[in-house]
Amino acid sequence: MDLSPLVQRHYHDVLKHLYINPLEKCNLRCKICYTRKTNPILSEEEILAFISKYEHAEKLSIVTFCGGEVFTLPYFPRLVNTLTEKGIFVQVITNGTVDTLDKFSDPNSVNLIVSLDGLPDYHDANRGKGNFLKSSAFLKKAQSLGFHTEVFSIVTRQNYKDLDEFERYLANLLGYRISVTYHPRKPPAYLVHHPISNIVGQVDGFDFLTPQEMRELLRNKKTFPPKELGCYQIALASDGKVYGCCEGTVPLGVMTDEIGQLFSQLKKRLILWESANTLRNCLGCSQPDFVCGIKQYLT
Protein backbone atom coordinates (compact mmCIF):
# COMPACT_ATOMS: atom_id res chain seq x y z
CA MET A 1 0.00 0.00 0.00
CA ASP A 2 1.18 3.53 -0.78
CA LEU A 3 -0.08 6.92 0.31
CA SER A 4 -3.17 8.46 -1.25
CA PRO A 5 -2.42 11.33 -3.68
CA LEU A 6 -3.69 13.88 -1.13
CA VAL A 7 -1.42 12.65 1.66
CA GLN A 8 1.50 12.01 -0.71
CA ARG A 9 1.48 15.66 -1.83
CA HIS A 10 1.28 16.89 1.74
CA TYR A 11 4.06 14.53 2.85
CA HIS A 12 6.42 15.96 0.23
CA ASP A 13 5.52 19.50 1.31
CA VAL A 14 6.17 18.88 5.02
CA LEU A 15 9.63 17.46 4.35
CA LYS A 16 10.67 21.03 3.51
CA HIS A 17 9.73 22.11 7.05
CA LEU A 18 11.89 20.99 9.98
CA TYR A 19 10.93 21.29 13.66
CA ILE A 20 13.61 21.60 16.35
CA ASN A 21 13.11 21.64 20.12
CA PRO A 22 16.57 22.56 21.51
CA LEU A 23 15.57 22.53 25.18
CA GLU A 24 12.73 21.84 27.61
CA LYS A 25 13.81 24.37 30.22
CA CYS A 26 11.87 27.63 30.48
CA ASN A 27 12.01 30.93 32.35
CA LEU A 28 8.34 30.68 33.38
CA ARG A 29 6.43 28.24 35.59
CA CYS A 30 3.03 28.10 33.93
CA LYS A 31 0.37 26.36 35.99
CA ILE A 32 -0.91 24.18 33.16
CA CYS A 33 2.40 23.31 31.49
CA TYR A 34 2.50 19.59 30.68
CA THR A 35 6.20 19.16 29.79
CA ARG A 36 8.96 17.97 32.10
CA LYS A 37 11.89 20.38 32.34
CA THR A 38 14.59 17.86 31.51
CA ASN A 39 18.28 18.76 31.26
CA PRO A 40 19.45 17.99 27.69
CA ILE A 41 20.06 21.06 25.55
CA LEU A 42 21.13 20.87 21.92
CA SER A 43 24.20 22.93 21.12
CA GLU A 44 24.34 25.39 18.24
CA GLU A 45 26.86 23.10 16.54
CA GLU A 46 24.58 20.06 16.85
CA ILE A 47 21.65 21.96 15.37
CA LEU A 48 23.63 23.33 12.43
CA ALA A 49 25.16 19.91 11.73
CA PHE A 50 21.72 18.28 11.64
CA ILE A 51 20.35 21.02 9.38
CA SER A 52 23.33 20.68 7.04
CA LYS A 53 22.78 16.93 6.81
CA TYR A 54 19.07 17.49 6.24
CA GLU A 55 19.75 19.90 3.37
CA HIS A 56 21.74 17.23 1.56
CA ALA A 57 18.59 15.09 1.49
CA GLU A 58 15.85 17.68 0.95
CA LYS A 59 15.47 21.36 0.09
CA LEU A 60 14.71 23.04 3.41
CA SER A 61 12.43 26.08 3.36
CA ILE A 62 11.35 26.53 6.98
CA VAL A 63 12.73 25.68 10.41
CA THR A 64 10.45 26.04 13.44
CA PHE A 65 11.98 26.33 16.91
CA CYS A 66 10.13 25.68 20.14
CA GLY A 67 11.01 24.93 23.76
CA GLY A 68 11.04 25.34 26.66
CA GLU A 69 11.91 28.94 25.89
CA VAL A 70 14.39 29.24 23.05
CA PHE A 71 15.03 32.95 23.69
CA THR A 72 16.89 31.94 26.88
CA LEU A 73 19.59 30.28 24.74
CA PRO A 74 22.57 32.67 24.43
CA TYR A 75 23.36 31.41 20.93
CA PHE A 76 19.80 31.64 19.59
CA PRO A 77 19.90 35.01 17.74
CA ARG A 78 23.19 34.02 16.08
CA LEU A 79 21.74 30.65 15.06
CA VAL A 80 18.66 32.26 13.51
CA ASN A 81 20.83 34.80 11.68
CA THR A 82 22.93 31.98 10.24
CA LEU A 83 19.80 30.27 8.90
CA THR A 84 18.16 33.37 7.46
CA GLU A 85 21.42 34.25 5.69
CA LYS A 86 21.12 30.85 3.97
CA GLY A 87 17.62 31.75 2.76
CA ILE A 88 15.77 29.63 5.32
CA PHE A 89 12.61 31.11 6.84
CA VAL A 90 12.49 30.67 10.63
CA GLN A 91 9.47 30.34 12.90
CA VAL A 92 9.83 30.71 16.67
CA ILE A 93 7.25 29.67 19.25
CA THR A 94 7.91 31.78 22.35
CA ASN A 95 6.28 33.11 25.49
CA GLY A 96 7.48 36.58 24.51
CA THR A 97 9.00 37.53 27.87
CA VAL A 98 12.70 37.45 26.86
CA ASP A 99 13.50 40.27 24.46
CA THR A 100 16.60 39.86 22.30
CA LEU A 101 14.83 41.09 19.16
CA ASP A 102 17.47 43.72 18.37
CA LYS A 103 20.03 40.94 17.78
CA PHE A 104 18.21 39.50 14.75
CA SER A 105 19.56 40.71 11.42
CA ASP A 106 16.63 39.87 9.10
CA PRO A 107 13.25 40.24 10.88
CA ASN A 108 11.34 39.79 7.62
CA SER A 109 12.60 36.19 7.48
CA VAL A 110 11.33 35.35 10.97
CA ASN A 111 7.80 34.60 12.18
CA LEU A 112 7.28 34.96 15.94
CA ILE A 113 4.42 32.88 17.34
CA VAL A 114 3.76 34.33 20.78
CA SER A 115 1.80 32.55 23.51
CA LEU A 116 -1.12 34.59 24.85
CA ASP A 117 -3.75 32.52 26.63
CA GLY A 118 -6.60 35.01 26.68
CA LEU A 119 -7.43 38.31 28.31
CA PRO A 120 -4.76 39.79 30.64
CA ASP A 121 -6.02 38.54 34.02
CA TYR A 122 -6.60 35.02 32.75
CA HIS A 123 -3.24 34.87 30.95
CA ASP A 124 -1.39 36.06 34.06
CA ALA A 125 -3.24 33.57 36.26
CA ASN A 126 -1.49 30.83 34.28
CA ARG A 127 1.84 32.41 33.29
CA GLY A 128 2.53 34.84 36.14
CA LYS A 129 1.59 38.40 37.05
CA GLY A 130 2.71 41.01 34.55
CA ASN A 131 3.51 38.56 31.77
CA PHE A 132 0.62 39.57 29.50
CA LEU A 133 2.05 43.08 29.48
CA LYS A 134 5.55 41.76 28.69
CA SER A 135 4.35 39.49 25.89
CA SER A 136 2.09 42.08 24.29
CA ALA A 137 4.92 44.66 24.41
CA PHE A 138 7.16 42.03 22.76
CA LEU A 139 4.58 41.62 19.99
CA LYS A 140 4.32 45.36 19.42
CA LYS A 141 8.09 45.75 19.23
CA ALA A 142 8.43 42.76 16.92
CA GLN A 143 5.85 44.19 14.55
CA SER A 144 7.58 47.58 14.54
CA LEU A 145 10.91 45.92 13.67
CA GLY A 146 9.43 44.05 10.72
CA PHE A 147 8.99 40.55 12.15
CA HIS A 148 6.01 38.46 11.12
CA THR A 149 3.79 37.78 14.13
CA GLU A 150 1.08 35.38 15.25
CA VAL A 151 -0.52 34.36 18.54
CA PHE A 152 -0.77 30.84 19.96
CA SER A 153 -3.44 30.48 22.64
CA ILE A 154 -4.26 27.58 24.99
CA VAL A 155 -7.99 27.03 25.49
CA THR A 156 -9.68 25.77 28.66
CA ARG A 157 -13.30 25.83 29.78
CA GLN A 158 -12.65 29.15 31.53
CA ASN A 159 -11.47 31.14 28.49
CA TYR A 160 -13.40 29.25 25.81
CA LYS A 161 -16.40 31.59 26.02
CA ASP A 162 -14.15 34.67 25.65
CA LEU A 163 -12.32 33.80 22.40
CA ASP A 164 -14.12 36.34 20.22
CA GLU A 165 -13.66 39.05 22.84
CA PHE A 166 -9.99 38.09 23.10
CA GLU A 167 -9.51 38.57 19.35
CA ARG A 168 -11.17 41.98 19.46
CA TYR A 169 -9.03 42.95 22.46
CA LEU A 170 -5.85 42.00 20.61
CA ALA A 171 -6.89 43.93 17.51
CA ASN A 172 -7.46 47.06 19.60
CA LEU A 173 -4.25 46.56 21.57
CA LEU A 174 -1.98 45.91 18.61
CA GLY A 175 -3.69 48.06 16.02
CA TYR A 176 -4.09 45.19 13.57
CA ARG A 177 -5.96 41.88 13.43
CA ILE A 178 -3.39 39.23 14.28
CA SER A 179 -3.74 35.56 13.36
CA VAL A 180 -4.58 33.40 16.39
CA THR A 181 -4.17 29.61 16.53
CA TYR A 182 -6.02 27.93 19.38
CA HIS A 183 -4.57 24.94 21.17
CA PRO A 184 -7.02 23.01 23.37
CA ARG A 185 -5.49 22.20 26.73
CA LYS A 186 -3.94 18.76 26.44
CA PRO A 187 -6.83 16.37 27.18
CA PRO A 188 -6.53 13.52 29.69
CA ALA A 189 -6.27 11.07 26.77
CA TYR A 190 -3.02 12.83 25.79
CA LEU A 191 -1.56 13.10 29.29
CA VAL A 192 -2.29 9.47 30.17
CA HIS A 193 -0.56 8.09 27.08
CA HIS A 194 2.41 10.42 26.55
CA PRO A 195 5.53 8.88 28.16
CA ILE A 196 7.23 12.21 28.94
CA SER A 197 4.92 15.19 28.47
CA ASN A 198 2.34 14.06 31.00
CA ILE A 199 2.17 16.60 33.82
CA VAL A 200 -1.47 17.41 34.60
CA GLY A 201 -0.72 20.69 36.34
CA GLN A 202 -3.42 22.81 37.95
CA VAL A 203 -6.99 22.01 36.93
CA ASP A 204 -8.90 24.37 39.22
CA GLY A 205 -9.56 27.46 37.11
CA PHE A 206 -8.12 25.79 33.99
CA ASP A 207 -10.52 22.93 33.31
CA PHE A 208 -10.29 20.63 30.29
CA LEU A 209 -12.75 21.32 27.49
CA THR A 210 -15.86 19.17 27.32
CA PRO A 211 -16.25 16.92 24.26
CA GLN A 212 -18.83 19.35 22.83
CA GLU A 213 -16.55 22.35 23.37
CA MET A 214 -13.64 20.49 21.80
CA ARG A 215 -15.66 19.69 18.68
CA GLU A 216 -16.96 23.26 18.42
CA LEU A 217 -13.44 24.67 18.75
CA LEU A 218 -12.10 22.39 16.01
CA ARG A 219 -15.02 23.29 13.77
CA ASN A 220 -15.10 27.06 14.27
CA LYS A 221 -11.52 28.22 14.93
CA LYS A 222 -8.02 27.77 13.55
CA THR A 223 -6.57 25.11 15.82
CA PHE A 224 -3.50 23.03 16.51
CA PRO A 225 -3.74 20.18 15.83
CA PRO A 226 -5.90 21.17 12.83
CA LYS A 227 -9.10 19.22 12.30
CA GLU A 228 -7.74 17.77 9.04
CA LEU A 229 -4.49 16.79 10.85
CA GLY A 230 -1.36 16.74 8.67
CA CYS A 231 0.77 18.38 11.37
CA TYR A 232 3.55 15.80 11.10
CA GLN A 233 7.14 16.61 10.18
CA ILE A 234 10.67 15.60 11.08
CA ALA A 235 11.04 16.86 14.66
CA LEU A 236 14.38 16.91 16.47
CA ALA A 237 14.08 16.87 20.27
CA SER A 238 16.52 18.15 22.88
CA ASP A 239 17.69 14.61 23.76
CA GLY A 240 18.73 13.92 20.16
CA LYS A 241 15.75 11.71 19.34
CA VAL A 242 13.82 12.42 16.15
CA TYR A 243 10.04 12.14 16.05
CA GLY A 244 7.37 12.29 13.39
CA CYS A 245 5.73 15.35 14.91
CA CYS A 246 6.32 17.90 17.65
CA GLU A 247 4.19 15.89 20.10
CA GLY A 248 5.57 12.47 19.17
CA THR A 249 5.60 9.56 21.61
CA VAL A 250 7.62 6.97 19.65
CA PRO A 251 10.80 8.20 17.90
CA LEU A 252 11.55 7.58 14.25
CA GLY A 253 15.24 7.41 15.13
CA VAL A 254 18.03 9.63 16.42
CA MET A 255 19.84 12.67 15.06
CA THR A 256 22.83 10.61 13.90
CA ASP A 257 20.64 8.49 11.58
CA GLU A 258 20.62 9.10 7.86
CA ILE A 259 17.92 11.60 6.91
CA GLY A 260 16.56 9.30 4.22
CA GLN A 261 16.03 6.63 6.87
CA LEU A 262 14.02 9.09 8.99
CA PHE A 263 11.91 10.02 5.94
CA SER A 264 11.24 6.34 5.30
CA GLN A 265 10.13 5.75 8.89
CA LEU A 266 7.79 8.74 8.74
CA LYS A 267 6.23 7.48 5.52
CA LYS A 268 5.68 4.03 7.06
CA ARG A 269 3.76 5.68 9.92
CA LEU A 270 1.54 7.50 7.43
CA ILE A 271 0.87 4.32 5.47
CA LEU A 272 -0.17 2.67 8.74
CA TRP A 273 -2.53 5.58 9.41
CA GLU A 274 -4.07 5.37 5.94
CA SER A 275 -4.65 1.63 6.24
CA ALA A 276 -7.21 2.25 9.01
CA ASN A 277 -8.31 5.85 8.40
CA THR A 278 -12.03 6.55 7.99
CA LEU A 279 -11.86 10.37 8.10
CA ARG A 280 -12.61 12.33 4.94
CA ASN A 281 -10.11 14.88 3.56
CA CYS A 282 -7.64 13.89 6.28
CA LEU A 283 -3.96 14.69 5.72
CA GLY A 284 -2.77 11.93 8.02
CA CYS A 285 -1.04 11.49 11.37
CA SER A 286 2.35 10.03 12.26
CA GLN A 287 1.03 8.73 15.59
CA PRO A 288 -2.06 6.70 14.54
CA ASP A 289 -2.57 5.21 18.01
CA PHE A 290 -2.23 8.59 19.74
CA VAL A 291 -3.40 11.52 17.55
CA CYS A 292 -2.59 13.94 20.41
CA GLY A 293 -5.54 12.55 22.37
CA ILE A 294 -8.14 14.14 20.08
CA LYS A 295 -9.06 11.25 17.78
CA GLN A 296 -12.48 10.81 19.36
CA TYR A 297 -13.38 14.41 18.45
CA LEU A 298 -12.58 14.14 14.73
CA THR A 299 -15.34 13.45 12.21
Regions found by a protein language model. Name each.
Residues 21, 42, 86-89, 111-117, ...:
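Radical SAM enzyme [4Fe-4S]-AdoMet core and its adjacent flexible, acidic
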Residues 1-103, 108:
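Conserved alpha-helical substructure of the radical SAM core
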Residues 37, 67, 116, 184, ...:
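Residues that line or immediately flank small-molecule/substrate-binding pockets and catalytic motifs
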Residues 29, 59, 108, 147-148, ...:
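Short loop/turn motifs at secondary-structure junctions
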Residues 24, 31, 64, 229, ...:
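Secreted/extracellular small peptides and ectodomain modules produced from precursors
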Residues 1-16, 241-299:
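Flexible mid-to-C-terminal extensions adjoining Fe-S/redox cofactors in radical SAM and related proteins
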Residues 19, 23-26, 224, 275-278:
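Residue-level signal for mature regions of secreted extracellular proteins and peptides
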